[in-house]
């Protein structure tokens, strides 16, 4: 049986690649981080916050992080 790729893994990997490429300067990877958080938000909406993926913070922490970054939905 084929293993399924965890939700939002490409976005999580993009953050790792960005950090590596930018000498671990997180401020240069804001877009990649925002993309991951948006992906995670979509994932949790689709699973009624019951889905599990190693690539995303828990739903409560995700909401906090999105609010801090001004990414909350209107």
From Swiss-Prot:
Keyword annotations from UniProtKB, A to Z: Disulfide bond, Mitochondrion, Repeat
Domain of life of the native organism: Eukaryota
GO CC list: mitochondrial intermembrane space
Cystine pairs: 8-39, 18-29
Location of the motif Cx9C motif 2: 29-39
Chain span(s) of sequence motif Cx9C motif 1: 8-18
A Pfam short name: CMC4
Span of domain CHCH: 5-47
Protein family (similarity comment): Belongs to the CMC4 family.
Domains as described in the record: The twin Cx9C motifs are involved in the recognition by the mitochondrial disulfide relay system.
Protein name as it appears in the record: Cx9C motif-containing protein 4, mitochondrial
Organism: Zygosaccharomyces rouxii (strain ATCC 2623 / CBS 732 / NBRC 1130 / NCYC 568 / NRRL Y-229)
């Amino acid at each position: 049986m084929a293993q399924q790729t965890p939700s939002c893994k490409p976005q999580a990997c993009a953050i790792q690649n960005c950090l590596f490429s930018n000498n671990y300067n997180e401020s240069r990877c804001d877009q990649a981080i925002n993309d991951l958080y948006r992906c995670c938000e979509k994932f949790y909406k689709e699973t009624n916050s019951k889905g599990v993926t190693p690539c995303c913070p828990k739903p409560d922490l995700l909401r906090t992080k999105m609010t801090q970054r001004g990414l909350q939905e209107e």
